[in-house]
Regions:
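Active-site-proximal beta-alpha loop/turn segments in soluble metabolic enzymes
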Residues: 1-3, 31-34
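C-terminal alpha-helical cap/extension of soluble enzyme domains
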Residues: 95-96, 107-198
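Glycine-rich, proline-tolerant flexible connector loops at the mouths of alpha/beta enzymes
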Residues: 1-11
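Aromatic/hydrophobic pocket-lining residues that form the small-molecule binding cavity
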Residues: 12, 16
Length: 198
C-alpha cells in the first residue's frame, strides 16, 4: 500500500483495483509496512481478501496472540508473512505462513535452521525468538531513528558476514550505517545469538 499517505477506504479499494489490473494474470502480495500511514486491521484484511481474490498474500508487522486470532479469517484466503523476529510465535501459535526475514538478512543458514526448529522443537524456537527480539532491539536501537529499514537490513547482512563483498551501501537518497559500526554489531549478534551462526 502507499505508505506516504493514509488512504481512506474508497481510495484503498481504487488503488488495489488498479494494481491488480496491472498485474493480471499474476496474483499479488501486498506490503503494509509498520511505518505506513495506514495500518490495516485484521477485519479490513478479511474484507479486502474477500473482494480481491487476486490478492494472495500480505507482508505485515505481525502482532500478539489477539492479533493472530483476529487474523485467522483473513488467513484462510491469504498467506500472512510477518517480521522474521516474530516468526516462531506466528507459526507455532498464530496464523503466519512465513516471514520476510530480517533474521535471514543476518544469517540465511541460521534462519532456515531456526525455522526447521519451529516445527521440530517449538518450545526452544520460541525461547530463541525472545533472544532474537532482545538482541535485535539492543543492537539496532541506536540506528532505528536515524536510518531506514533498508539500511538496517544491509547492516544486518554485512554484520552476518555470510557472503563476500557485502557492504552497508544503500541506494540514493538513503543514508548507510557507517562501516565502522559493523564490527560491534557483528560481535553483539554472534555473542547474543550463537545458534544462528553454528
Amino acid at each position: 500500500l502507499p505508505e506516504w499517505t493514509p488512504l481512506n477506504w474508497e481510495e484503498l479499494n481504487r488503488f488495489l483495483e488498479r494494481v491488480i489490473a496491472a498485474a493480471h494474470p499474476i496474483p499479488i502480495v501486498l506490503y503494509n509496512p509498520p511505518y505506513a500511514q495506514k495500518i490495516l486491521k485484521p477485519e479490513e484484511w478479511s474484507e479486502i481478501s474477500a473482494r480481491f481474490p487476486a490478492l494472495i498474500g500480505i507482508k505485515v508487522a505481525g502482532g500478539d496472540a489477539t492479533w493472530h486470532e483476529e487474523m485467522r479469517p483473513a488467513s484462510n484466503s491469504l498467506s500472512v508473512f510477518v517480521a522474521g523476529t516474530q516468526l516462531a510465535s506466528g507459526l507455532v501459535h498464530g496464523c503466519a505462513s512465513g516471514s520476510y526475514s530480517n533474521v535471514a538478512c543476518l544469517s540465511p543458514k541460521g534462519a532456515c535452521e531456526w525455522e526447521q526448529r519451529m516445527r521440530s522443537d517449538p518450545e526452544i524456537a520460541l525461547q530463541q525468538e525472545a533472544q532474537i527480539q532482545n538482541v535485535f532491539a539492543d543492537a539496532l536501537s541506536p540506528f532505528r531513528q536515524r536510518y531506514s529499514n533498508t539500511a538496517l537490513d544491509k547492516a544486518l547482512a554485512t554484520s552476518g558476514g555470510w557472503a563476500e563483498g557485502l557492504t552497508t551501501n544503500v541506494r540514493w537518497p538513503l543514508s548507510k550505517i557507517p562501516t565502522d559500526e559493523i564490527e560491534s554489531l557483528a560481535t553483539q549478534f554472534r555473542a547474543g545469538l550463537p545458534f544462528l551462526f553454528e
